[in-house]
Regions:
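Non-transmembrane, aqueous-exposed alpha-helical and coiled segments at domain scale
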Residues: 2-391
């Protein structure tokens, strides 16, 4: 897509601008040894790759180690929401009912709802699942972003103008705003996607309202697809993904961003927009997009996708910075806390296999499985240091 002229520097000034770039890089350079000398963390991971403790929370707990005879050892990862093992929450939802709504209730209020409480909560969310035609036209359809995360930020920030009491940060008002965002963000995400596809790829534009009788996962799928159709398995898998991404210990980049921004006393919409900005980054939520791009690149450069040696050669080139985006990162591999396994990956992998079987895409699933197996081996033995790595 051609850059808008109002965002471009005159060609005649390019050389001078490049000189300024060099000066800027020199001016901002810090000797890397100083970080170790003054024990300054360069982000939310320590120099050894482990997560940095940034606060305390009882909402969720993430563990990747166990202590045996006073010695800390790698262990299979565990994720708890308000004391509940997330595997049990997702398992109940997959087999019996959709779990995202009751998980949201659990995270907000500290306990699982009974049937009556869940029905009331469903009713509140359903009553808020609406975006005015003016909002959709003026905010989402005009100047749609090539990256959906920017569209989400813009939309969330603009909701401030539609709120009669946006700056009140009392618990009751922030809860009201939070429920509004929980209800409206699925619509905002889907509508931004449709606008993106329409204006950048000339797809037909189909905007559908949410249906109050459906779960969040079902509504996303029926609004996303022109024919509104989806299979029960697709809805269950998406519901599981929503549950597993609902919370993660309070120390990840976007949640930490929210802590920092809200500490200034700013409004809910500004804080959430800042968190979305953080989530967009390729070393946080944006890594999902990088995984897709990396696999597309792998398809182009590996002739036999069932050959372990060719896959390993490609991944080694990625780690050297000679392939893909030259970052030296295998996206989707490694975690600041988890060691032997990531419980979210274990659960989603099981449902991904079921989905692949139903779609006739087991070869593609096997490729992802192969990259996971080979990639973890390469990363675990990188620099001749054996370190547990989870996908």
């Amino acid at each position: 897509m051609k850059t808008n002229s109002m965002m471009s520097i005159d060609d005649a000034l390019d050389a001078k601008f490049n000189e300024l770039v060099v000066s800027c890089m020199k001016s901002g350079a810090i000797d890397l040894n100083l970080y170790q000398e003054y024990d300054v963390k360069r982000g939310l991971r320590d120099s050894n790759g482990k997560g940095v403790l940034t606060g305390l929370t009882e909402i969720s707990d993430v563990t990747g180690y166990r202590v045996v005879d006073g010695v800390k050892e790698p262990a299979d990862g565990m994720l708890y929401y308000q004391g509940y093992d997330v595997k049990n929450l997702v398992g109940d939802g997959i087999e019996k009912r959709f779990a995202f709504e009751e998980t949201t209730y659990l995270l907000l209020f500290g306990y699982l709802p009974n049937k009556e409480q869940l029905e009331v909560f469903h009713g509140i969310i359903a009553s808020l699942q609406e975006l005015s035609g003016q909002f959709v036209r003026d905010v989402i359809m005009k100047a749609p972003s090539a990256n959906l995360m920017n569209g989400l930020q813009k939309s969330v920030l603009t909701l401030y103008s539609y709120d009669a009491n946006p700056d009140d940060i009392s618990v009751s008002n922030v809860l009201r705003q939070s429920l509004q965002l929980i209800a409206k963000l699925p619509l905002i995400a889907v509508y931004n996607y449709h606008a993106y596809r329409h204006f950048h790829f000339f797809d037909s534009l189909v905007i559908k309202p949410a249906k109050p009788e459906l779960s969040t996962a079902e509504n996303i799928l029926q609004m996303l697809r022109p024919n509104g159709k989806y299979t029960p398995l697709e809805a269950r898998v998406l519901d599981a993904a929503l549950v597993l991404h609902a919370e993660h210990g309070g120390g990840n980049n976007s949640t930490f961003t929210n802590h920092v921004v809200t500490s200034s006393g700013t409004d809910t919409y500004s804080a959430v927009a800042a968190s979305i900005a953080s989530l967009k980054g390729p070393r946080h939520g944006g890594a999902n997009l990088k995984v897709q791009q990396m696999f597309a690149d792998l398809h182009e450069h590996v002739t036999d996708l069932e050959d372990d040696d060719q896959i390993q050669e490609y991944l080694q080139a990625v780690l050297r910075g000679d392939a893909f985006d030259h970052s030296g990162l295998i996206y989707g591999m490694g975690h600041a806390v988890y060691t032997l396994s990531d419980p979210r990956e274990v659960i989603l992998k099981d449902y991904a296999q079921k989905l692949a079987e139903s779609k006739g895409m087991l070869k593609e699933y096997s490729l992802y499985d192969r990259v996971e197996r080979i990639g973890t081996q390469l990363l675990s033995h990188r620099n001749h240091v054996v370190k547990p790595i989870s996908a």
